[in-house]
């Protein structure tokens, strides 16, 4: 027996060998992942962007699953093709004079899920590099093949994959569901040993993540040995994220799942581009292109920069502005967003990788996954609104271990300087937003039932147990399950007479299948949970295709109208066959396109840090450059009112010619503020009928009453957590009147609480919890629904739900249906279900999504409870404070044209700046013309004279203004107008009803002709 000293050295692991060829050494977290994979364990890997997560999982997979080398038999998950190829390989022999056939490729072993199909090509390239190099020395890996399958995959490659899938397949959740819908799905997918969910944080919190959970449960049923690994860089609730990923594998596997956190020394720099002259009275987006010269200077000092913006319209504006400022950068400056043609996007991505581009103005289309090593720096125009998004974008620079990442925030209004300081503090504290899986989305479950019926069929009891393994459907009641089965079987009670909705039926053996080939093709064409507005192709007349734009915008343009798209000024020629034909315009003022969508709300984590920064300013501590820069605004706010702190709730009251104002600053985010504002207005109307206008932003809300209100006395009643009983129809409750074209459509309707109707199991579809203390939330939901036009909001939500559930047939590949057609179809179903099928689960889901997503009821309730623990500070104002001013501008936007709004803002700015310049004496000076004090003075004539003098409206001219003063005011209005055109699109895209200024501008329509019951 040889002595220990004479034994041969243990061979180095395969992964270390490959890293050594690159001159790299593995990080400890990579070794930990390799050990877990070798043991067949699943888990979640969390590490900073660019730390080497891909190599950690991929090299571990090659070590664990790439050395078996034998063909699997049927009992081991081998396919018929594997066995046939193995037989052919063994049939020939040298004695027969025939050359032995090469061994067959390994079957599908690794599924790599990416959230964006645009990332598939880059991911595949990253996986192929070590695979090809290791295959030269590892015979078993030589039989591994690789490929991608997404919506962009060509027909030839799809055909080849239909005959044999590659060993490692990079795909999307939608394409995985398509594979599950194949009749031979079990034979194809039962060989999978590893599923990787890349960028798990992007999937976890939405329906695509639920789609992944259901698919994993299906795969685990076919192969209990399958491993699942998730990768993420920006998650705040790691144990919950791991459980959501691993729960579909079974309780035992989930309990043994590992959580690996990569600790890599990587420097992150978060700084801010400070404005030269920050304004004391700011509103969303008002800085606009004033920061353009500073941005251009920053771009001049770096070789390659990504300029991130939050919306596509803002990307078009900034790209054009930078190119106008530096026309010599043509060819070095590019634009990238999801509406551009795929060829354009790929050209931009290639230019970034090769270092040919100086800068790219982009949206979230470049947030994820793609490695652009030449990128040195990232600029973020406007607030990122969340820490996770900030970290994700920062990681696009220095995307490699050991290289620093730098992101520079460019504020679009003065208060975003406070957000910038708060964001840096949150990053230093290691705080990141949490993400949770949606609860029981019925539309996704209905779609999955049809998919599984296509993929070999299912037995209801077995599938029910399988579905309940997922976190999303862990508490799925039996009654809801039976409703879903009935819905896919016969369409429910209201669609029972229509064959198109009788999609799934049990066969003689009790297996539920989809017998109609036509309905099968229709379902496969519309699998997925991504719902977007109908779009049109934009194509140069007799030229190239530029991309797509939403039909709602293009349909409003007439021939000859100009608009900006793909960084060019285009002129509309005609619209034909859902294609907008354009030509490049030589002149004309272009319209900036708008894409439908909601404004991104400020995350609760970032909002808490903003309040902490304000508390430091209130204590006189201006430690950061951002706070020192914005100090003039904060000083005026503190002198005229107060600064919010974590322990106080600031309320401001003001009397103007418009009425009686209440400003509140809960810092709960835009969505929660919409619900709070409507709730407070409804409560105020219960004691006395009134007319209210509402405005909201991320910091606070405004209520404006046309009749006198003692807001200070009303506040305790408005801010209570426990709800009062909802008045029944016909009661003596005071109505809440709304002016035409004003505010949120708030209605005192007792039947709005119908969303709380209970299903046959006795459980509310809208989660209220089971503990007695959650009764407050249940009652609050009734009150919130009673205060809102919940029906209209639910109708808009229902369109998306109906599409996912398969009620609306969007199109066959290559076809397009207009938004009007889709909207008409969804509205018809909505009205029919409300009339004939009030217990329809899809209707209830629409109500629940309105509460949980559009109004963020959970955050609303949390805000009310936090308010109860705070000291209420009520500050009467003589004029709008710096915090109140942007709320007033939000409200003005909803009823004034750009011209009128610019004049109004310029006049108010002149008055407020004059008062602010007066220093401490301003509080005692007469208020400006737009403001009437709570107690009118005894000598109004002197008051009006002082107001005229302050605004320059005394002497000469039609309006009484002196020529010089009038010219100055006109110049100020023009300056405001230039930034206003930008700010109206820079804040966020329009289109989500209540998002822009806090009210819904959509009008109720008469119900369409109901579908007859046969």
Predicted regions mapped to residue ranges:
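Helicase motor core with emphasis on the C-terminal RecA-like subdomain
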Residues: 7-8, 20, 25-31, 38-51, ...
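Intrinsically disordered, low-complexity domain-flanking/linker segments in eukaryotic proteins
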Residues: 70-105, 729, 733-759, 763
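Extended, highly charged accessory segments
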Residues: 464-535, 549-550, 593-594, 601-748, ...
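A conserved acidic, glycine/proline-rich C-terminal tail/linker
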Residues: 543-561
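Short beta-strand-centered aromatic/proline hotspots
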Residues: 568-575
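Short, solvent-exposed secondary-structure boundary/capping segments
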Residues: 576-593
């Amino acid at each position: 027996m040889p002595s220990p000293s004479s034994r041969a050295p243990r061979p180095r692991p395969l992964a270390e060998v490959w890293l050594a060829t690159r001159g790299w050494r593995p990080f400890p977290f990579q070794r930990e992942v390799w050990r877990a994979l070798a043991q067949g364990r699943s888990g979640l890997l969390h590490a900073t962007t660019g730390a080497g997560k891909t190599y950690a999982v991929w090299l571990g997979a090659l070590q664990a699953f790439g050395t078996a080398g034998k063909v699997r038999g049927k009992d081991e998950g081998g396919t018929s093709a594997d066995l046939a190829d193995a037989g052919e390989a063994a049939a020939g022999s040298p004695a027969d004079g025939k050359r032995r056939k090469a061994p067959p490729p390994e079957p599908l072993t690794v599924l790599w899920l990416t959230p964006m199909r645009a990332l598939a090509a880059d991911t595949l390239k990253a996986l192929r590099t070590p695979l090809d190099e290791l295959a030269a020395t590892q015979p078993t890996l030589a039989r591994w093949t690789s490929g991608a399958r997404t919506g962009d995959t060509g027909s030839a490659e799809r055909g080849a994959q239909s005959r044999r899938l590659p060993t490692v397949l990079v795909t999307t959740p939608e394409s995985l569901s398509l594979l599950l819908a194949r009749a031979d799905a079990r034979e194809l997918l039962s060989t999978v040993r590893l599923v990787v969910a890349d960028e798990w944080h992007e999937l976890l919190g939405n329906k695509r993540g639920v789609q992944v959970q259901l698919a994993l449960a299906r795969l685990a049923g076919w192969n209990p040995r399958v491993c699942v690994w998730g990768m993420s860089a920006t998650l705040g609730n790691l144990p919950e994220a791991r459980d959501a990923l691993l729960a579909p594998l079974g309780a035992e596997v989930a309990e043994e799942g590992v959580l690996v956190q990569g600790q890599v020394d990587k420097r992150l720099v978060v700084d801010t581009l400070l404005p030269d002259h920050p304004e004391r009275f700011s509103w969303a987006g008002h800085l606009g292109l004033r920061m353009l010269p500073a941005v251009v200077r920053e771009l001049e000092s770096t070789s390659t920069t990504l300029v991130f913006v939050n919306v596509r319209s803002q990307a078009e504006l900034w790209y054009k502005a930078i190119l106008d400022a530096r026309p010599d950068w043509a060819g070095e400056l590019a634009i990238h967003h999801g509406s551009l043609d795929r060829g354009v996007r790929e050209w931009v991505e290639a230019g970034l990788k090769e270092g040919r581009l100086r800068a790219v103005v982009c949206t979230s289309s470049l947030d994820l996954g793609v490695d652009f090593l030449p990128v040195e720096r990232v600029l973020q125009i406007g607030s990122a609104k969340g820490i996770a998004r900030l970290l994700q974008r920062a990681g696009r620079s220095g995307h490699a271990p050991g290289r620093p990442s730098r992101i520079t925030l460019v504020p679009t209004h003065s208060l975003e300087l406070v957000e910038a300081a708060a964001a840096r503090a949150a990053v230093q504290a290691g705080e990141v937003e949490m993400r949770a899986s949606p609860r029981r989305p019925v539309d996704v479950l209905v779609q999955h039932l049809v998919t599984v019926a296509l993929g070999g069929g299912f037995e209801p009891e077995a599938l029910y147990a399988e579905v309940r393994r997922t976190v999303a459907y862990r508490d799925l009641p039996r009654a809801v399950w039976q409703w879903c089965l009935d819905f896919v079987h016969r369409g429910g009670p209201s669609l029972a007479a229509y064959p198109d909705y009788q999609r799934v039926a049990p066969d003689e053996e009790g297996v539920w299948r989809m017998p109609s080939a036509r309905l099968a093709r229709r379902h496969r064409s519309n699998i997925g949970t991504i719902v977007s507005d109908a779009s049109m192709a934009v194509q140069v007349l007799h030229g190239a295709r530029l991309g797509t734009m939403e039909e709602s915008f293009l349909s409003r343009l007439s021939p000859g109208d100009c608009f900006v798209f793909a960084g060019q000024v285009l002129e509309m020629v005609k619209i034909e066959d859902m294609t907008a034909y354009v030509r490049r315009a030589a002149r004309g003022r272009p319209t900036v396109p708008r894409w439908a969508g909601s404004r991104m709300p400020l995350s609760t984590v970032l909002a808490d840090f903003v309040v902490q920064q304000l508390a430091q300013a209130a204590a006189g501590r201006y430690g950061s450059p951002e706070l020192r820069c914005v100090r003039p605004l904060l000083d005026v706010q503190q002198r005229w009112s107060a600064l919010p702190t974590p322990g106080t709730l600031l309320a401001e009251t003001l009397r103007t010619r418009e009425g009686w104002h209440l400003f509140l600053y809960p810092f709960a985010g835009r969505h929660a503020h919409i619900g709070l504002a409507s709730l407070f207005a409804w409560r105020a109307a219960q004691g006395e009928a009134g007319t209210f206008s509402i405005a909201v932003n991320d910091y606070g809300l405004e209520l404006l009453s046309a009749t006198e209100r003692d807001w200070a006395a009303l506040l305790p009643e408005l801010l209570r957590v426990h709800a009062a009983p909802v008045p029944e129809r016909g009661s003596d409750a005071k109505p809440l009147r709304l002016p035409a074209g004003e505010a949120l459509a708030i209605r005192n309707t007792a039947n709005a609480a119908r969303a709380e109707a209970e299903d046959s199991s006795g459980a509310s579809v809208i989660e209220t919890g089971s503990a007695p203390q959650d009764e407050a939330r249940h009652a609050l939901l009734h009150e919130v629904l009673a205060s809102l036009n919940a029906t209209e909001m639910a109708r808009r939500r229902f369109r998306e739900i109906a599409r996912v559930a398969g009620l609306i047939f969007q199109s066959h590949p290559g076809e397009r249906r207009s938004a009007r057609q889709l909207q008409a179809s969804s509205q018809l179903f909505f009205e029919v279900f409300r009339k004939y099928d009030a217990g329809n689960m899809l209707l209830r889901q629409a109500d629940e999504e309105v509460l949980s997503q559009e109004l963020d009821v959970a955050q609303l309730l949390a805000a009310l409870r936090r308010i109860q623990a705070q000291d209420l500070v009520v500050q009467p104002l003589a004029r709008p404070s710096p915090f109140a001013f942007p709320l007033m501008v939000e409200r003005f936007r909803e009823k004034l044209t750009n011209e009128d709004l610019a004049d109004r803002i310029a006049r108010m700015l002149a008055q407020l700046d004059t008062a602010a310049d007066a220093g401490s004496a301003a509080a005692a000076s007469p208020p400006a013309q737009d403001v009437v004090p709570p107690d009118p003075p005894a000598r109004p004539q002197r008051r009006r004279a002082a107001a005229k003098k302050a605004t320059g409206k005394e002497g000469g001219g039609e309006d009484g203004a002196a020529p010089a003063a009038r010219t100055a005011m006109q110049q100020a209005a023009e300056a405001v107008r230039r930034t206003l055109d930008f700010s109206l699109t820079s804040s966020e895209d329009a289109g989500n009803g209540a998002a822009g200024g806090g009210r819904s501008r959509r009008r109720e329509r008469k119900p369409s002709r109901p579908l007859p019951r046969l």
